[in-house]
């Protein structure tokens, strides 16, 4: 039987990184999204063959489509056991003082990114 695989968005730091670590320690292969090659290399060195980095931004549909094509090809005839939509940002401070563009960016990443 092949190793169980999951996909987690936003694994560079924080909750995503902790989730990546948890699943690798429990015998899973994790496909994880990062936004740059530096993070991809750093995490690949740590998690080796248990981790496949996917470089994309959840707000960029073309990048997402490329990642999906790669995943389908890499998984061959198996499926992902789970998808963890973790990628997100938090803009600190009262909503009253946020710029509209910053609020829209937060919604685009946290809400629309999970939908895409």
Where are these regions (language model features)?
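Conserved hydrophobic beta-strands of the Rossmann-like cofactor-binding core
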Residues: 5-8, 80-84
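Conserved glycine-rich cofactor-binding loop
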Residues: 12-14
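Aromatic pocket-lining residues of Rossmann-like dinucleotide-binding sites
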Residues: 23
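Conserved glycine-rich Rossmann-like NAD(P)H-binding loop of the short-chain dehydrogenase/reductase
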Residues: 26-42
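The beta1-alpha1 cofactor-binding region of Rossmann-like NAD(H)/NADP(H)-dependent oxidoreductases
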Residues: 56-67, 100
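Conserved NAD(P)H cofactor-binding loop of Rossmann-fold oxidoreductase domains
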Residues: 86-91
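Substrate-binding pocket helix/loop in short-chain dehydrogenase/reductase
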Residues: 94-95, 102-105
């Amino acid at each position: 039987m092949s190793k169980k695989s999951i996909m987690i968005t936003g694994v560079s730091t924080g909750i995503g990184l902790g989730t990546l670590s948890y699943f690798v320690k429990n015998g899973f292969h994790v496909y994880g999204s990062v936004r740059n090659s530096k993070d991809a290399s750093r995490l690949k060195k740590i998690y080796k063959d248990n981790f496949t980095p996917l470089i994309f931004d959840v707000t960029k549909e073309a990048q997402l489509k490329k990642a999906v094509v790669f995943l389908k090809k890499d998984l061959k005839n198996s499926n992902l056991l789970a998808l963890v939509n973790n990628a997100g940002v938090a803009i600190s401070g009262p909503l009253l003082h946020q710029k509209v563009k910053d609020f829209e960016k937060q919604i685009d990443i946290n809400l629309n990114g999970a939908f895409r």
